Amino acid sequence: MESGSMKTPLVNNQEEARSSSSITCGLLLSTSVAVTGSFVYGCAMSYSSPAQSKIMEELGLSVADYSFFTSVMTLGGMITAAFSGKIAAVIGRRQTMWIADVFCIFGWLAVAFAHDKMLLNIGRGFLGFGVGLISYVVPVYIAEITPKAFRGGFSFSNQLLQSFGISLMFFTGNFFHWRTLALLSAIPCGIQMICLFFIPESPRWLAMYGRERELEVTLKRLRGENGDILEEAAEIRETVETSRRESRSGLKDLFNMKNAHPLIIGLGLMLLQQFCGSSAISAYAARIFDTAGFPSDIGTSILAVILVPQSIIVMFAVDRCGRRPLLMSSSIGLCICSFLIGLSYYLQNHGDFQEFCSPILIVGLVGYVLSFGIGLGGLPWVIMSEVFPVNVKITAGSLVTVSNWFFSWIIIFSFNFMMQWSAFGTYFIFAGVSLMSFVFVWTLVPETKGRTLEDIQQSLGQLS
């Protein structure tokens, strides 16, 4: 859900090699290892949903305590996200993923063996450090190893594995104790740590440090022995040199009229993605079913079943349907489904209609998950990689990523308190935000499908 809950950074997609646009075993292996991190992210994001009731009961946590435990991961993510671009640039993409796994393993172990809220929060915070790095480096790595012809679908494999992690946590959380669940969640981190030794470093990162021989060997591994990688290698070198010349701008250069439109798009989509309530659904799904009087084990299992197929469909649709239609359809769907969820809570207080509450809730939540997945779940990050000029990409990427984590923290921390205030009112607010998202996309977000980065950025600069 997150996306997003998981967070795709700003990368330069200008290189394209006509002779190397094929899918090879090396490319599939490297992508599979990288998106294991996305799976870890999905597990971490949704762990708090099935674990909530037992953790609160066994450790004697209040609603405020558990809200902080759930949201502290986003604070940790916000910290490392602010430096993730620099870290990945200095030590490399693979090494950054390896460090993220170390953080996550420590975090899961701390949660599993916690006997008080302090160690519980420390563990959740370390998970945040790990997924904050993952949210940046995994999409960067995939974008930099994938031929342009397949980049949209491969980039959405992020969303697919996040959804798979969320689904697995929703489903297995019905059968395992929360401590066992935390220990099991550390296993994918260890698997990725080992497998990272068997995949190549990003070709662009190698070019940045002048490692020409390794660059060519890596491209051969990714494109196949029969692939002609000379043109692609030359374009990577040219793009890296251009980035080196033009990326000296800082935060001051981001905030000027030329970049006003891209900045509004970036921050606006991040705010709307979170304020429609997506992080709350992932983090508190079981609690939502419980408070609505529907069995949480059945409800979360239903969500688990639909998440992965939905992500597979979107992965193949993103380069065919266009960004704007999917975003606007997603926004309208979220508006309708949030209203239905709110209506189910409202009807609980009216005896004549209580038998309709559970069916309306299920339809609303299933529709919400489907609607979020087709647009606002992953597409804001795809668009972010396309709208910012080269000279502010790193700065803009850090700002947008940190903003997304911050907006996510606001929703996750405040959700339980909002539900205590008014359950139906909370979802009516989410419905209103989703409607605002439709208007925002309709008026401000351009269609980027099939356009070059130069064309997109030039048109946005003229409008600013």
From Swiss-Prot:
Annotated TM spans: 23-43, 72-92, 95-115, 125-145, 156-176, 180-200, 263-283, 298-318, 326-346, 359-379, 399-419, 424-444
PROSITE patterns membership: MFS, SUGAR_TRANSPORT_2
Compartment(s) where it occurs, according to its Swiss-Prot or TrEMBL record: Membrane
Chief place of localization: membrane
Keyword annotations from UniProtKB, A to Z: Membrane, Sugar transport, Transmembrane, Transmembrane helix, Transport
CDD domains: MFS_GLUT6_8_Class3_like (cd17358)
Domain of life: Eukaryota
Pfam families, alphabetized: Sugar_tr
Keyword Membrane: yes
GO cellular component, one term: membrane
Molecular-function GO terms, alphabetical: sugar transmembrane transporter activity
InterPro entries: MFS_dom, MFS_ERD6/Tret1-like, MFS_sugar_transport-like, MFS_trans_sf, MFS_Trehalose_Transporter, Sugar/inositol_transpt, Sugar_transporter_CS
Membrane topology: Multi-pass membrane protein
UniProt family annotation: Belongs to the major facilitator superfamily. Sugar transporter (TC 2.A.1.1) family.
Role, per record: Sugar transporter.
Name the UniProt record assigns to this protein: Sugar transporter ERD6-like 1
Species the sequence originates in: Arabidopsis thaliana (Mouse-ear cress)
The organism's taxonomic lineage, starting at the top: Eukaryota, Viridiplantae, Streptophyta, Embryophyta, Tracheophyta
